[in-house]
UniProtKB/Swiss-Prot annotation:
Name of this chain's protein: Uracil phosphoribosyltransferase
Required cofactor(s): Mg(2+)
Reactions the enzyme catalyzes: UMP + diphosphate = 5-phospho-alpha-D-ribose 1-diphosphate + uracil
Cofactor binding description: Binds 1 Mg(2+) ion per subunit. The magnesium is bound as Mg-PRPP.
The UniProt record lists the keyword NAD: no
GO BP annotations listed: UMP salvage; uracil salvage
Keyword Nucleotide-binding set for record: yes
Gene3D superfamilies recorded: 3.40.50.2020
InterPro entries cross-referenced by the UniProt entry: PRibTrfase_dom, PRTase-like, Upp_B, UPRTase/APRTase, Ura_phspho_trans
Amino acid sequence: MRTLVVDHPLVAHKLTVLRDKNTPSPVFRQLTEELVTLLAYEATREVKTQPVEIETPVTKTVGTAFTKPTPLVVPILRAGLGMLEGMTKLVPTAEVGFLGMARDEETLDIITYAERLPEDLTGRQIFVLDPMLATGGTLREAIKFLFKRGASDVTCICLLAAPEGLSKLEEELSDANVKIVLASIDEKLNEKSYIVPGLGDAGDRLYGVAG
């Protein structure tokens, strides 16, 4: 497993505004989209490509194209949906699947409640979208789910991570072909397993609280 924290002034600026509790949901959504596009630029550096011959208005030349099948983007519901637009703007030809996983706030167990993915993921490059890597439980279970379907190349794009969650992932996935791309590794988890300083509940800040 590899971890990359994207060090860029635009990333730091947008993340600072996201952290601010006074940032309204519409602005939060827009900044999340913009930040994910910046992270995705780094996350896709190793995307699989092949040479392709094209003809410009002047002459024939050899360029670069994605290999087939194209990358598969998998947002983890519901907060991961807020990251999807930023990713597909950069990679519009990617296919999109969905994985519904949630943490029980009392037991901290991970519950899988929905999935829409190909049965066979062999040979697919997969990009998982999940804004907060807190305990690491959700992402760990998502990666295991994808590996069971045949995946062997998974990149996870997150806004923030806690050191505790990263350590747990490293323990269980140290030899796996997994890359974690982040805007920041924060200080710690609090007693409720929230990232500190963090930015609060990403899903609630993206979409509000329904119910």
